[in-house]
């Protein structure tokens, strides 16, 4: 299945000059959604994954079903102030300013084999923040998996030492 055909592209959203990749169309079509998760599972089945980490919000959409299919736990990474227990945090840079992500301090145990799952790799800034938190807790990142990669933004280069996978690539 060509997943690129299943992704709706919206020009000028959320602002002029942006070509937004809308993954809700994959979620709506049961065959495409199943194919996406099954493809990721096939890539990861021999990695002995303990935990899948998904960044807010679209990382939840692919990370949770992936964790279930792998028989692994799922850890959500949220924006600051959204998690109820003791957290660790990491700041990351945006085009104009910065933001902060958090995860529960007890969500990753030392030595656990971790996969990060998200919808899109652009510059890699968000994922670097997630990596920082996982590694500070002693987790071993065995793979980072994306549905979409915007290759021109060179996020993969920022994540160079990790095993990176993307199912669909766009040159922007």
UniProtKB/Swiss-Prot annotation:
- Tell me, what is one Gene Ontology molecular-function annotation carried by this entry? AMP binding
Which cell locations does it reside in? Cytoplasm
The EC number of this protein is: 2.4.2.7
Q: Does the keyword Disulfide bond apply?
A: no
* Keywords (A to Z) from UniProt: Cytoplasm, Glycosyltransferase, Purine salvage, Transferase
Q: What's one Pfam family the UniProt record gives for this protein?
A: Pribosyltran
Name the enzyme's class. Answer: transferase
Quote a single Gene Ontology cellular component term. Answer: cytoplasm
InterPro entries, per database record: Ade_phspho_trans, PRibTrfase_dom, PRTase-like, UPRTase/APRTase
Q: How does it assemble?
A: Homodimer.
Xref: NCBIfam families: apt, PRK02304.1-2, PRK02304.1-3, PRK02304.1-5
Q: What name is this protein filed under?
A: Adenine phosphoribosyltransferase
Lineage, uppermost ranks? Bacteria, Bacillati, Bacillota, Clostridia, Eubacteriales
- The gene designation is apt
């Amino acid at each position: 299945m060509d997943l690129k055909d299943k992704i709706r592209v919206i020009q000028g959203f959320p602002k002029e000059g942006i070509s937004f990749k809308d993954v809700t169309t994959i979620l709506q079509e049961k065959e495409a959604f199943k194919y996406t998760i099954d493809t990721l599972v096939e890539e990861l089945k021999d990695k002995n994954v303990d935990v899948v980490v998904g960044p807010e919000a679209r990382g939840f959409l692919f990370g949770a079903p992936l964790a279930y299919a792998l028989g692994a736990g799922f850890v959500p990474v949220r924006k600051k102030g959204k998690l109820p227990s003791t957290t660790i945090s990491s700041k990351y840079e945006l085009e104009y300013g910065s933001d902060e992500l958090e995860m529960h301090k007890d969500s990753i145990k030392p030595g656990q084999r971790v996969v990060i799952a998200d919808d899109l790799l652009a510059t890699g800034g968000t994922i670097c923040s997630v990596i920082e938190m996982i590694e500070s807790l002693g987790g071993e990142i065995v793979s980072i998996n994306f549905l979409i990669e915007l290759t021109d933004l060179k996020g993969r280069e920022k994540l160079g030492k990790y095993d990176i996978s993307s199912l669909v690539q766009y040159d922007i």
